[in-house]
């Protein structure tokens, strides 16, 4: 029986996938401590979008969060963060001195391992950052970024087992120092067959004892199958998550994968009862956070227009903020062409952001009318060399609109010449704002820009979306506005016309103005469908199956004939119930004396 290790990605990737990375530190530390007690030894705790989100939305410092996590787990647990090569944890690529500062600061604040990837798989972008991670005394996990391609696109030779193994050979030839190798599929679109063949080939290429880790999401519904294929191919460790931030756009749940491995030659070797308890605690802690419905859904369209789980929910949160969520189906549809014409870079941050920004522009302004800044610079080569040559017409449009010539120069050299990047430039910004010029503050300014400076000045806002906030937003509107908003948000859904009609019927029914004379009449109304109801301000999804509901009409009460010498009711003594419940029968009439035993 082979034991398969796992890394719990709940506290970074799970938060990013399900809550748009907007979670307070104090709300997850108890679950982190409980997971350690249950036996988890590896955690992804920060980096990626969770670095900026703490400053942008949570009114917190990412370095303080790392310190708190290390204090909770103790000295021996592996705490891992995610880095984007030359971008480190910023959305723009950085100069060499900031890349080096990133590694030294994360070591200082309790991190054990940095997973280091480049979405374009330009090995030059992994070389310098990997060396800095190694020099800082951290473990360097070098990454092969994976992605599934839409049908009929495999002839490009990108994102095939041979392509990935060639990239691995480039890493080995470049002599980049590494402690382990990860295969990361942020969109969850790589097929199980490609996963198996790739990891099987990598196992043959790598020195004996090299740890291979596999990362995927369940966005397209293939997470369990791909994890098992990775294990069969020779992976030593897989990335898993815990409810409520598991499944759908997030990673496969620990308990789900434990169940899949039962009866095979593999095991996670966990006490499942302990993890049931930890997940129950975690669910309770996360209850107040609003989780958008798309976060937990399997979306088959993602296989054709790859969007990472972490980016999908982060972008839908922002689209909600800007009242553009109704455009999402068309944006996702337009992503297919954007990926193909952009050169097939893996759909993972920051490239996934470039894809969705360009797809959004194509949706809003017309196809290829406007080339967005990030996408344009990418196809022109300013972030590295894409896996395939971008579309010539798109490159021409980018050149004309951005006024920048195509380049094959090393990104680090370009950035080192940029006067608005680097330690000196950001020190000057801090000095101008009267902010202490510490290494941490320099890095925050470099990676978070104006919002980072604002945070350091105490000017930050809470951008977390709680269930109570959503409930208030809905309650503040009239029923007609709620129905109209629901129609607009779901106008592209299959069968939605029928559901909308039912909703409108239910919302528009008002009690009659006056009693209706005549016998009681029962009317059968159809209520099948999915609805959201609110109990104490918390939304709950409710499904009504086909059946009938009784809708009694009001019946006029016949006049009461005045009785002669009607007896006065007994004053009585209140009898409080021992506990809350339902009244199922009444043994006596009003005014009668209650006897013992009744």
Language-model-detected regions and their locations in the chain:
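N-terminal amphipathic alpha-helix/helix-capping segment at the start of soluble metabolic enzymes
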Residues: 1-18, 66
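Hydrophobic faces of well-ordered beta-strands that scaffold small-molecule active sites
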Residues: 5-13, 41-45, 77-84, 112-115, ...
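Conserved, mostly hydrophobic/aromatic
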Residues: 6, 14, 35, 116, ...
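Terminal or standalone catalytic/regulatory effector modules within metabolic enzymes
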Residues: 36-54, 296-301, 310-556
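Active-site beta->alpha loop and helix N-cap motifs at the rims of alpha/beta catalytic domains
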Residues: 42, 47-166, 187-190
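Catalytic cores of alpha/beta
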Residues: 98, 159, 163-166, 220-235
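Glycine-rich phosphate-binding active-site loops on the catalytic face of alpha/beta enzymes
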Residues: 116-119, 185, 233-252
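Short histidine-centered loop motifs in beta-beta connectors
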Residues: 578, 584-593
């Amino acid at each position: 029986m082979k034991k398969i290790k796992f890394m719990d990605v709940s506290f970074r990737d799970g938060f990013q996938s399900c809550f748009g990375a907007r979670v307070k530190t104090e709300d997850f530390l108890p679950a982190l401590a409980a997971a350690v007690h249950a036996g988890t030894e590896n955690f992804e705790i920060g980096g990626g979008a969770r670095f900026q989100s703490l400053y942008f939305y949570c009114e917190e410092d990412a370095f303080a969060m790392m310190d708190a996590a290390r204090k909770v787990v103790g000295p021996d647990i592996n705490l891992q963060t995610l880095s984007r090569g030359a971008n480190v944890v910023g959305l723009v690529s950085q100069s060499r001195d900031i890349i080096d500062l990133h590694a030294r600061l994360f070591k200082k604040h309790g991190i054990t391992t940095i997973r280091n990837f480049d979405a374009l798989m330009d090995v030059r972008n992994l070389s310098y950052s990997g060396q800095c991670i190694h020099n800082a005394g951290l473990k360097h996990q070098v990454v092969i970024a994976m992605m599934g391609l839409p049908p009929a696109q495999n002839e490009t030779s990108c994102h095939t087992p041979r392509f990935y193994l060639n990239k691995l050979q480039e890493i080995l030839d470049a002599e980049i120092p590494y402690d382990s190798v990860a295969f990361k599929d942020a969109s969850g679109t790589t097929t199980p067959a490609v996963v198996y063949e790739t990891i099987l080939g990598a196992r043959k290429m790598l020195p004996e004892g090299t740890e291979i880790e596999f990362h995927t999401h369940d966005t397209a519904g293939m997470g369990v199958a791909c994890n098992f294929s990775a294990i069969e191919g020779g992976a030593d460790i897989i990335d898993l998550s815990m409810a409520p931030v598991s499944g759908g756009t997030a990673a496969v749940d620990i308990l789900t994968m434990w169940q899949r491995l039962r009866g095979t030659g593999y095991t996670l070797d966990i006490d499942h009862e302990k993890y049931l308890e930890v997940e129950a605690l975690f669910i309770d802690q996360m209850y107040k956070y609003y989780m958008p419905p798309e976060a937990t859904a399997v979306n088959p369209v993602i296989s054709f227009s790859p969007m990472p789980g972490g980016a999908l929910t982060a972008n839908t949160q922002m689209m909600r903020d800007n009242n553009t969520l109704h455009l999402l189906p068309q944006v996702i549809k337009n992503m297919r062409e954007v990926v193909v014409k952009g050169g097939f870079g893996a759909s993972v941050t920051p490239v996934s952001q470039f894809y969705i920004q360009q797809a959004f522009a194509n949706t809003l302004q017309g196809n290829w009318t406007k080339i967005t800044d990030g996408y344009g610079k990418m196809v022109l080569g300013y972030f590295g060399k894409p896996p395939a040559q971008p579309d010539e017409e798109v490159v021409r449009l980018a050149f004309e609109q951005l006024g920048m010539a195509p380049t094959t120069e090393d990104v680090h050299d370009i950035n080192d010449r940029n006067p608005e990047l680097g330690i000196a430039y950001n020190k000057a910004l801090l000095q101008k704002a009267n902010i202490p010029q510490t290494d941490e503050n320099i890095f925050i300014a470099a990676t978070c820009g104006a919002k980072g400076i604002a945070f350091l000045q105490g000017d930050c806002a809470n951008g977390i979306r709680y269930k109570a906030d959503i409930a208030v937003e809905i309650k503040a509107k009239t029923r007609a506005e709620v129905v109209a908003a629901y129609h607009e948000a779901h106008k592209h859904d299959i069968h939605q016309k029928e559901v909308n009609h039912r909703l409108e019927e239910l919302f528009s029914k008002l009690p009659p103005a006056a009693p209706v004379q005549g016998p009681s009449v029962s009317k059968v109304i159809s209520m099948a469908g999915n609805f959201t109801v609110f109990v104490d301000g918390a939304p709950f999804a409710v499904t009504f199956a086909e059946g009938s509901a009784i809708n009694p009409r009001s019946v006029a009460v016949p006049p009461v004939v005045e009785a002669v010498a009607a007896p006065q009711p007994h004053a009585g003594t209140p009898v409080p119930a021992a506990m809350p419940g339902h009244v199922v029968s009444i043994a006596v009439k009003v005014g009668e004396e209650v006897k013992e035993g009744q």
